[in-house]
Amino acid sequence: MRKFDYSFLNNGLLPANLVNLTSNIAALKTMAGVRKNEYTQIFTELEAVAKVQSIKSSNAIEGIVTSDERIAAIVNQNSAPLNHNEAEIAGYRDALNEIHLGYEHIDFRQSDILRLHEMMMSFAGYEYGGQYKTDDNVILEIDADGNRRVRFRPTPASETPKAMEQLELAYLDARSNANINQLLLIPCVILDFLCIHPFRDGNGRMSRLLSLLLLYKNGFDAGKYVSFEEQINNYKAYYYEALRQSSAGWETNENSYFPFIENLLSTLYMCYKELDKRFAVVHGKKITKKARVEATVLNSLTPLSKAEICKILPDVSPTTVEAVLGAMVKTGSVKRIGAGRATRYIKV
């Protein structure tokens, strides 16, 4: 059986790029904490936007989709699901809300993991929600010619409860070691969870929920305000390649965690960088939405479209962005380049 041992994180032989990533994340985390205390309303608005994006993206990765309008209604208005996909989405909404509101009281324990899985699967009516798999599963891949082959064989169903018990204990043991950086430990645990593949269905979505849970519990909550799952979805080819590399040799305890660690930390770093962009204003001033739009354009080295500004500042309405840009063009602080959908704005 697979042995779960994270002591290598304490031997000082870590790649320099991972050490640098953790340092950069820590610095951005400190800045975000200061801003959160000062700009509570902005963070509340960002959280509402990110929640919709997270629920949409985490399900989309698994091919579970519906319209943006329906996603918003399910998330913000508790609209009843109209079909199977929407039932899956509603279940993820409930599990994510549970983590957002109660992460301090939830832990990486089998009981909590099973409860979150049951919650996630409940709307879709699956009988196996909250239960470990009873049949063995395999991870398939399809080559360019359409041929299927087994890419990975997860832990057999008969060994899954024991493997999950050992994973839980190994994590709790490593977590209590003050010399182990939690940012490096979390990706290792998530990788092992994915390789066990403990459930018949929903393992990928559960891995993202558990990633957020462990990050939040350790104070790294950028994923609340900039969708962690959307970043994964945007760069999912890199995610799956890192997962492939780190799972190679897993069954025989010969795998390297480093590719997956780098991918998860890079995703978290992008969340913090995006969050930082949304506060790109002159220090000392009250951050109004108008000031944030102005600063976003004035601090950019390249021309920006209205759509790009709206993506950077998702809590600011397109109408507000358009009004501010129009005023800036009139005052001469920026100039308009192009026309129609190709219109961009750049500092004069």
What are these regions (language model features)?
Residues M1-V348:
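FIC/Doc superfamily catalytic core
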